[in-house]
Amino acid sequence: MSLYKPVKIGNLELPGNLFLAPVAGYSDKAFRSVCVENGACFTYTEMVSAEALIRDNWKTEGLMARAYNEKAYSVQIFGGTEDVMQQAAKIVLEKTHCECIDINCGCPVPKVTKTGAGSALTRDPERLYKIAKAVIDVCQDVPVSVKIRSGWDKNTMTWKEAAQAALDAGVKAITIHPRTKAQAYE
C-alpha cells in the first residue's frame, strides 16, 4: 500500500503528498530542485519578507525564483500588517506565477515576532484573520495557505484558534509546526 496520494489545495491538484516545508536558510531553489528530483511534488520557498518585497529588494526577489524542475511551488511571505502583506502578495503573483502563497505564522525569531509577524500571528487570531483575508482578496484563483506553530509557549497553546481564524478567512491549507514559539528550534 502506497502512502503517496494525490492532494488538492483549493483548485490546485497535486499528484502526490510529499511536500518540502518552508525552512529559512534551507529551502532555496537548489535544495528544492534536489527534493523534486527525489520525489517531492510540491515545495515552498524559504520565508520572504513582505516589507523587503514592497521596497523592491532584488535579493529578496531571488528567494522566490522557481527551480527549473518545479511543476508546483508556493512562495511563503511574512509580515505584520494587512496592507504590506496584500501588496507583497500582488508582487509575488506578478513576478513568480507560483501555484500557492503561504503566510508564515511560525517564525519564532525575535526580529520577526516583534513586528507582529511570524509566530506572533498565532497568538493574535484576529490579526491573522485580517492578514489572511487581505492576501486572499488579491490572490483570486491562487490558493493561500498558512504555517502556524502550536502556540506561543506551553501556557498559551493557540493553534486551534489560529487555525480557525485562518479557515474563516478562507485559507485552503494549514501546516502545523508542533512546537511553540518559546521552543524555537529545539
What are these regions (language model features)?
Residues 1-186:
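Flavin-dependent oxidoreductase catalytic cores
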